Amino acid sequence: MANQRIRIRLKSFDHRLIDQSAQEIVDTAKRTGAQVCGPVPLPTRIERFNVLTSPHVNKDARDQYEIRTHKRMLDIVQPTDKTVDALMKLDLAAGVDVQIALG
């Protein structure tokens, strides 16, 4: 797999979980002899919701909620066949969304 790159994007609502998963990927890639760039923290997406607490009047009384989506990106440069096999067998946490792109 000469002159190839694997780009991995991770998304999660919990920053501790995403950092732990990124560290597992980095350790696995380095153990199999590939170079790793990252993890690079990407901007956190913050969604805010305002909900009226009263069912009828009192528009001033509201609850505010937010969801933070944390993102990380890793580049694995010059992956070996062992690296690809190890990444396929890697078991990550359920709360982490993984997107893999070959380039």
Swiss-Prot record:
One GO-annotated biological process of the protein: translation
Record keywords, A-Z: Ribonucleoprotein, Ribosomal protein
Keyword Aminoacyl-tRNA synthetase part of the UniProt annotation: no
GO MF, one annotated term: tRNA binding
GO CC terms: ribonucleoprotein complex; ribosome
UniProt entry tagged with the keyword Ribonucleoprotein: yes
InterPro entries: Ribosomal_uS10, Ribosomal_uS10_CS, Ribosomal_uS10_dom, Ribosomal_uS10_dom_sf
SUPFAM superfamilies: Ribosomal protein S10
Family annotation (Pfam families): Ribosomal_S10
Subunit record text: Part of the 30S ribosomal subunit.
Purpose: Involved in the binding of tRNA to the ribosomes.
Similarity field: Belongs to the universal ribosomal protein uS10 family.
NCBIfam families in the cross-refs: PRK00596.1, rpsJ_bact
PANTHER family: 30S RIBOSOMAL PROTEIN S10 FAMILY MEMBER
The protein's name: Small ribosomal subunit protein uS10
Species annotation: Psychrobacter sp. (strain PRwf-1)
Gene that encodes the chain: rpsJ
